[in-house]
Amino acid sequence: IRVYRYAYDTPCDFYADRIRLEPDGRHTFDLVCPDRVIRDCTPGVPGWVNVENCVAAAAMLWVAGFDEAKLRAAIASFSGVKRRFDFYVNTPKHIYMDDYAHHPNELRAAITSVREMFPARKLTVVFQPHLYTRTRDFYREFAEALSLCDEVLLLPIYPAREEPIEGVASEMLLPLIGCPARVVRKKDLTDVLKSKNPELLVTFGAGDIDRFCTQIAGLFAEK
């Protein structure tokens, strides 16, 4: 069995090289394949994670025998997956995005991408930790990633299948986050955001935070 490896930018069978940020927030890169380099590929959506997704998809197409023109066209038409850099509001005054990131490495990569895309805007993030065990094991790493923001609102931990663990709560991140941060109850979230009127807002998490997206987007329509 032939095994192929792919990566974001680590040299292997398939990876992205010479990654550049475009003015619209998307990334252009050279796709390195085992037998060629396909230069200047630009996915249809922004974000580092989408570069890696494109590399993975292109690798499968290459194995299936697609030629360079079709590989390039497939990357250009890539529109992302649900809850990965989903734009709900994108106006000169306000930007609101939602993303599924729920692991510290994902969170850091996503926040870094947003910072690259909109370097002049104040970044407000709403993060809903997912699982008590994950929060317990990675709360320091979560806090480190969230420190890249200008302001953080933490929702209570989404338990999913787990029972509460004594002493494990969103509050344990607060002393370690290097920017203004607070815990907000879900029922108060929209009121808090309405009072803050953030210019650049991203909601993160794998729980039920996406249920608020339409309601949050509506806040900006009122401005």
Task: Say what each PLM segment does.
Residues I1-I38, V81-R84, Y88:
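Extended acidic/charged loop-beta regions that coordinate divalent cations
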Residues V3, A16, N53, A57, ...:
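Residue-level signal for inorganic ion chemistry
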Residues R5, V125-F127, L154, T203:
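Structural beta-sheet core signal
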Residues C33-E151:
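Nucleotide phosphate-binding/pyrophosphate-handling subdomain across enzymes
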Residues H102, P129-Y132, I157-A160, A206-I209:
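Short glycine-rich anion-binding loops that position phosphate/pyrophosphate groups of nucleotides
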Residues D188-L219:
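A glycine-rich beta-strand to alpha-helix segment
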